């Protein structure tokens, strides 16, 4: 596994790497350059660095898998309520954990009542819920949420981290996998656990023509986002024995580098993932869209569209 390294002693602060980075992943700070989660390990900066301050280091032998165990579910809240994908993730986590003797954990980040909402997860067989509750988490700021979840991962060392394939989850998961220099498989539709704790992540590829099987064999944790409504919802257990742990939140953790200039609360509209009935229109629908919209309303569903 390759890791991108920076030697501040060799850096001349020429800025060539910043100018050439195609992803805007390098910024200049007082102490030198820093790399953020936009880095794709493409190597452009390494080739541009004349002083050899940036270089790739080959990590030998991979992670010691025995030091990483358990499955961590990111429990997303939507407008103060638990997102339904969380219960699907817990159900899948319990199935995977049973095969290798793991425990199932959850982590929640939010404002007031987050710890109260965490109680909803215990009846579904979660062994421990880690809660990061602070008013500074009001409104989703990807950097702050990533700091909180990364803190949990660093302390817990889970072998697998499952995140819902929502808009929030798709923003959060890549930041986390980059921080831990490990892999991420997005939009999984099926998960399997090997006896050696490698997670087989299955997802459609090439427009759904094939199903790709992806394994992160040399690094931990293993990150995967899972599409909503493709896994079975978790069943409640007879005797819940889990607990809730409220974690300390530092001021740095809630100090965001993102400045919100304005915000507008939109009326909640059901997403197509939540609908039981969909009327789908393609490019050829033309002037029939009004009729299709009326049909969707009569059927109690929603009108949606294919790719252009």
Label every model-predicted segment.
Residues 1-308:
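N-terminal glycine-rich FAD/FM-binding segment characteristic of electron-transfer flavoproteins
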